[in-house]
């Protein structure tokens, strides 16, 4: 509902941008005395094309509206009508007339200046809180741009721009700057070292596990939880020395492994006596090399092989575990029986079984694709088992594949001798040597602890398979371990 504003107030629209207050007063002053001329301007003090003129006599205002409406002024047709109040302001709050206090000293002419068409610093006679937009003509021309800044609050009374307008603009600028800086910092964080390092390490583990663990992917990556419980860690007497070796091995193998269980460093404790300690040092070194080619080492394999407490029996019993490790190296799912069957016997032989087993198992896992490591490590341990010292073994780490190790005094146990440690030395040299010795030492396991093997050790031609038949041969050795005697290879490949 539109109400007429002050009867003597006219709205003049469609003005030329060059028309100023003096021109308006000169043109409309012909119809009667003018109390006020209000030209609406923008922030640059340029005319926005409309103005308000207040006549002292309302009758003069009506005559001027009839006479000047639709006529051309400075090249543009203008509209002259009675100023109207906005519909949403009808019956609303009213302020006392402000024209008297805002009128210029001459009392005749004043130009209201403000941003967005608002009449800041000057208010009309009746609706003081409304500016140019508060007075719309009968044509209902929209001046909403003038209404918005004026309704902000009492700041429109003052002559300057309202603080509520400047403050949000500053905040907006700061927010926009921060928003532009935000993505940069985020992008900078996205290229941080830890994420890239995790990506590379995970890629490396995936590639390594699929390439080097082709025969035992499930065994290396996902061991059964039953096998983790089978063999308890050794007594605390070995704990301190164990940490020294485990730290060294962990650092050497961390380049290819992502998750090393804390129990590995704890469970492979070196023995308390000198001779077995040297042996166990070898097994840890081998473990570190071979573990580099596997993705995850299960904690069960670390717990299974407790360090020996006595020297010579530890070697002997290691051979039986050695064959089991060969078989397990190529089997996807080792049964829990395989770890439980070879539970340590009485204390005299308990740790002997598990002394070289860690060395054997790891070397069997790594030798198929990395002959350099498997060869050198196998040679070291075969020499060490045959009686050479730890230092001699270390001197032969860099030897070629074809060079046989130095033959030390052959070790005997219960009358059976250890043979064929240096008989064959091809790409798979160390593993085939251990096969040849399995005929002698394997029979000192859980069922034949101290029984001397009466049979001759199997010949290399019979025991050694073709290198292309690595899977079958490993199953063959696993069958030897499970049954306690030599069996035929056929049918054992079904374990895969």
Swiss-Prot record:
Protein name per Swiss-Prot or TrEMBL: RNA-binding motif protein, Y chromosome, family 1 member C
GO cellular component assignments: nucleus; protein-containing complex; spliceosomal complex
Pfam family, one: RBM1CTR
Main location: nucleus
Region (Disordered): 80-349, 452-496
Extent of Basic and acidic residues compositional bias: 204-214, 242-253, 276-289, 313-326, 335-349, 484-496
Keyword Ribosomal protein included in the entry's annotation: no
Tissues in which the protein is found: Testis-specific.
Entry keyword annotation includes RNA-binding: yes
Summary of subunit composition and partner proteins: Interacts with splicing factor proteins SFRS3/SRP20, TRA2B/SFRS10, KHDRBS1/SAM68 and KHDRBS3.
Annotated localization: Nucleus
Sequence ranges assigned to domain RRM in this UniProt record: 8-85
SMART domains given in the database record: RRM (SM00360)
Keyword annotations of the record: Activator, mRNA processing, mRNA splicing, Nucleus, RNA-binding
Compositionally biased region (Polar residues): 175-184
Role description: RNA-binding protein involved in pre-mRNA splicing. Required for sperm development. Acts additively with TRA2B to promote exon 7 inclusion of the survival motor neuron SMN. Binds non-specifically to mRNAs.
Other remarks in the entry: The RBMY1 proteins are encoded by repeated regions of the Y chromosome, mostly within the AZFb region. The exact number of functional copies is unclear and may vary between individuals, and some of them may represent pseudogenes. The proteins are very similar, which makes the characterization of each protein difficult. Thus, most experiments do not discriminate between the different members. One can therefore suppose that reported interactions with a RBMY1 protein involve all the proteins.
Originating gene: RBMY1C
């Amino acid at each position: 509902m539109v109400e007429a504003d002050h009867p003597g107030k006219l709205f003049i629209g469609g003005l030329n941008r060059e028309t100023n207050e003096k021109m308006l007063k000169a043109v409309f002053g012909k119809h009667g005395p003018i109390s006020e001329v209000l030209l609406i301007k923008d922030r640059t003090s340029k005319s926005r094309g409309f103005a308000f003129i207040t006549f002292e006599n309302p009758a003069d205002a009506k005559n001027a509206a009839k006479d000047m409406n639709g006529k051309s002024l400075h090249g543009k047709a203008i509209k002259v009508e009675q100023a109207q109040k906005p519909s949403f302001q009808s019956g609303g709050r009213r302020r006392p007339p402000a024209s008297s206090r805002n009128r210029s000293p001459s009392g005749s002419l004043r130009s209201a200046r403000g941003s967005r068409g608002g009449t800041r610093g000057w208010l009309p006679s009746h609706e003081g809180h409304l500016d140019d937009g508060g007075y719309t003509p009968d044509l209902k021309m929209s001046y909403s741009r003038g209404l918005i800044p004026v309704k902000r609050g009492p700041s429109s009374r003052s002559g300057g721009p309202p603080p509520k307008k400047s403050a949000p603009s500053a905040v907006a600028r700061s927010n926009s700057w921060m928003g532009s800086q935000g993505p940069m910092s985020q992008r900078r964080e996205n290229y941080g070292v830890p994420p890239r390092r995790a990506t590379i390490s995970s890629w490396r583990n995936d590639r390594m596990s699929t390439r080097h663990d082709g025969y035992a992917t499930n065994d290396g990556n996902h061991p059964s939880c039953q096998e983790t419980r089978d063999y308890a860690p050794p007594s605390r007497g070995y704990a301190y020395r164990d940490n020294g070796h485990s730290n060294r091995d962990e650092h050497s193998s961390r380049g290819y492994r992502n998750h090393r269980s804390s129990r590995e460093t704890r469970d492979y404790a070196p023995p308390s006596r000198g001779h077995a300690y040297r042996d166990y040092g070898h097994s840890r070194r081998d473990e570190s090399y071979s573990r580099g080619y596997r993705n995850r080492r299960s904690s069960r394999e670390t717990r299974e092989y407790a360090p020996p407490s006595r020297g010579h029996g530890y070697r002997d019993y290691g051979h039986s575990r050695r064959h089991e490790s060969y078989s397990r190296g190529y089997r996807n799912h080792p049964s829990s029986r395989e770890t439980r069957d070879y539970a340590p016997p009485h204390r005299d032989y308990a740790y002997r079984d598990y002394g070289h087993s860690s060395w054997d198992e790891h070397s069997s896992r790594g030798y198929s694709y990395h002959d350099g490591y498997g060869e050198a490590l196998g040679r070291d341990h075969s020499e060490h088992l045959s009686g050479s010292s730890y230092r001699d073994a270390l001197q032969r780490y860099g030897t070629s594949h074809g060079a046989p190790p130095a033959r030390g005094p052959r070790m005997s146990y219960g009358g059976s001798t250890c043979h064929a440690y240096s008989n064959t030395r091809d790409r798979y040299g160390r593993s085939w040597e251990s096969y040849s010795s399995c005929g002698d030492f394997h029979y000192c396991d859980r069922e034949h602890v101290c029984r001397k093997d009466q049979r001759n050790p199997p010949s290399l031609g019979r025991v050694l398979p073709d290198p292309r038949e690595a899977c079958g041969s490993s199953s063959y050795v696993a069958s030897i371990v499970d049954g306690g005697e030599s069996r035929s290879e056929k049918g054992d490949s079904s374990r895969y």
